[in-house]
Amino acid sequence: MLLFTKLAAPKAPKRRSRAGCTSCKERKKKCNEERPQCSRCAERGSSCVYEPVRPRQRRKRDSFITSLADASTNGSHQHEAEEDDHGARFDRFDACEDHLSQHQRVSHDWGHQPWQASMPDSFDDDLIFSPLDDTFDPNVLLAAAPLETSSVIINPDEDFTGPLSSTTQPRVLRYEEDDDDGEEEIDIGGGGAGLIGIKHDRRSSFTSTTTVATNTTAGNTIFSTDLTICSPATVRSPLLEFTCPSFSEFSENPRQRSLVDHFCNVLSHLIVFREETGNPFQQLVLPLMRGGGGGGNNSPVADAVFALAGAHLEHRGVDVKGGEKSLYFHHRAIQGLAGLIRMHNAGVNRNEVLAAIMLLIYYEVLVQRGRSNIVEGHLKGALTVMCSNPEPLDSTGIFLERAFRFYDVIAALSFGTAPLSTAPAAGCLVPFPISAPTATSTLNNVDSLLGMATTLWPIIHRLSALLPLKTDVANARDAGHNGKVAVLRTEFETTVGAVEAALLGWTPNLPTGWVLHESDPTKLVEDTTAAKDENSTGEEKRSGGDSARLHSILNNALAYRNSALVYLYRTVLSHPRDHPLVQRHANLSLRHCAATVEHQGPMGALLWPLFVAACEAVTGADRDTARTAFAAIDKRQGMTNIERAWDIVQEVWRRAEGGTEETVRGEGVRSDTSPAQLSMACSRELKGTADMWRVVSKEMGVNIVFG
């Protein structure tokens, strides 16, 4: 409890030492004042001379200052009280008075009269603004006072290309001061700063001038305002008083901001391969959260982001209290998406619709609720939007279309149906991002969603259409349409041969200076036989930090290649589990999956090749490899489909060991039968081939999308 008040004694103003040696003063360096020789002079081997310290000189106050102080007694008393509390203001007040008196003697004869209550203020009330007002313009404050030219040195090599705005980069001031009373030099640095230095009186360094650089339509202009002349001070921005919460531009709700934070800092990194130029979900999808929501409602993209992030947290057992569950945001996203589709012809952003659909597909893949065809319905909706409005694609459109193609093929392989889109021509897919590749990066050939499998994806797209084509052959055979059977069978056999040859001949596009190891296909080594110039050598040295990520991305692509061959031989051509081709490529695929996990690289697209190869694993070593890989990706990704896929794999192993697996083979067909003969025999016996894992999945009542 405060019993009495007492004015604190004024603090002694801090003074700079002026007793340094002459050598340090000339160089404008700080002197430690050691005798007989300071450390700087001792280091340079120069003579160290100390001069007597001269007393400080103060300018005499003119009668104007005296009359001004007498006329404003109340203001003086208030200033003296502040001076008692803050002694550091003493010098600033003296400097202000000295500058005013000097300005009166040299420049003007103003003839000021003592202030009286009847006299109007020199500044109109209209010049006092609030930065929260819509009409607030900082340029009015700058133009309110007379301008005074400062001694400014302009670098001719620098230019001022931007207007004075909130995005202007701040200047970093570096003071280099002399120990004597006199001038001090301020170096203004920073990117693109055109000011080299400003020289002014040291005693008025805090109050005399403020220099601002701006660009007008007539040309570049540098001006300074004298704060002792323009008396009211500029109003500080309220944003300087507090820190805005992260992601406050997307939502005012703390719970929703935490979901955006989880999406940006966790989820977006789990589903891409390449982030050296930025995460595409953060750069391209996140800005779409601001659109589409009218009347205070969130946009469908925002609700889909909230649903996806919330479902991922809920699956990991994280209960973020104080907000709605992911299912609530999912329903809102569905309703908002339906409204956007109804208004699609009214100028609604096409990318916003596609982004909402793709995020909802990610949500459905994550939660995996029973045997539903919601993913297929979303994919059909996305295809309808893309076909109904074939606009020129920007970066966001290209990225969303790439994500659609990925899930279209993965869903076709998962459900055994034909893909909705047409297969892209060979060589038409280029790695995303397309623009501005980094010259020294080893990941220039890596796609953000497909990794190194960009050139492999058209082949896998054609592979996914083979099982439905085989089913069509069987249906035509049962219906007795012999002509149709002949046409479809020819198409099937031709496509099978082309896909098999393409898969066996495919090789990843490796970065410069790297080749596959001859004995271990999971490793990359430096190409020592090829001639290297200085630039390629530098690239190899700089790529050492990305070596682990590069190995992981490479093994992911090779796992897709070998699992595609397993799918071709086992599912499409109905080879038995113990067939040499099936076991060879299943073993290679599991080795590549293990190498992907070992290098701790991206694992977002590893589930399908790992699942296909693990279902055909026979030996204990292969099953241990599959078990380790499943545990690693489940720990990293935290998705429901990974857990359910692992449950199905274990059930397939149990049935295979118990001899209860339903093997589909034609009568009199040997294991070395050609693919064409085997496909004909299978088409006569059954309407397609049912994999054991599909039977198990149906019995468990789930549909798994291996994305």
Swiss-Prot record:
GO terms for cellular component: nucleus. PROSITE patterns: ZN2_CY6_FUNGAL_1, ZN2_CY6_FUNGAL_2. It comes from Pyricularia oryzae (strain 70-15 / ATCC MYA-4617 / FGSC 8958) (Rice blast fungus). One of its GO terms (molecular function) is transcription cis-regulatory region binding. The lineage of its organism: Eukaryota, Fungi, Dikarya, Ascomycota, Pezizomycotina. Residues 527-544 have a biased composition (Basic and acidic residues). SUPFAM superfamilies: Zn2/Cys6 DNA-binding domain. SMART domains: GAL4 (SM00066). Signal peptide: none annotated. A motif (Nuclear localization signal) lies at residues 14-21. Keywords: DNA-binding, Metal-binding, Nucleus, Transcription, Transcription regulation, Zinc. Residues 21-48 bind DNA. Transcriptional activator of the arabinanolytic system. Involved in the regulation of extracellular arabinanolytic genes and in the regulation of the intracellular activities of L-arabinose catabolic genes in the pentose catabolic pathway (PCP) in response to the presence of L-arabinose. This is L-arabinose-responsive transcription regulator ARA1. It is found in: Nucleus. InterPro entries: Fun_TF, Zn2-C6_fun-type_DNA-bd_sf, Zn2Cys6_DnaBD. Disruption phenotype: Shows no growth on L-arabinose and strong grwoth reduction on arabinan and arabinogalactan. One of its GO terms (biological process) is positive regulation of transcription by RNA polymerase II. It holds the Pfam family Zn_clus.
